[in-house]
UniProtKB/Swiss-Prot annotation:
Keywords: Metal-binding, Nickel, Zinc. This is Hydrogenase maturation factor HypA. GO terms for biological process: protein maturation; protein modification process. NCBIfam families: hypA, PRK12380.1. Involved in the maturation of [NiFe] hydrogenases. Required for nickel insertion into the metal center of the hydrogenase. Ni(2+) binds at H2. Zn(2+) binds at C73, C76, C89, C92. The gene is hypA. The keyword ATP-binding does not apply.
Length: 113
């Protein structure tokens, strides 16, 4: 379960921002998770509640923003939707695709006190 180490990284980001921005409590964490990132949202929820215990984010709401997958098809010269990495272009069936969205995992926003 790599989600545990990912959540530990999220806590590190939050603590670093708390020092830099001078806040003492996190009310809400918004995390963007791309459809192609191989991260399970429910596992992230579980792991975040486990690793945030005894931190400034202990009682924070954990909101997940889902980012759909998309890629640039070189053959079609346009952006196409992707449900899974390495699937063919839904329009031409080609495999010359460059992922443009959906592989991210990032802290989008924090609501703090």
């Amino acid at each position: 379960m790599h989600e545990m180490s990912l959540c530990e990284g999220v806590i590190e980001i939050i603590e670093r921002e708390a020092q830099q921005q001078n806040f003492a409590k996190v009310r809400t964490v918004w995390l963007e998770i791309g459809a192609l990132s191989h991260v399970e949202p429910e596992a992230m929820r579980f792991c975040f509640s486990a690793v945030s215990h005894d931190t400034i984010a202990a009682d924070a709401r954990f909101e997940i923003v889902s980012v759909p997958g998309a890629a640039w098809c070189m053959a079609c010269a346009k952006t196409v939707p992707l449900k899974q990495r390495y699937e063919p272009c839904p329009d031409c069936g080609g495999h010359q695709l460059q992922v443009t969205a959906g592989d991210e995992l990032r802290v989008k926003e924090l609501e703090v006190d």
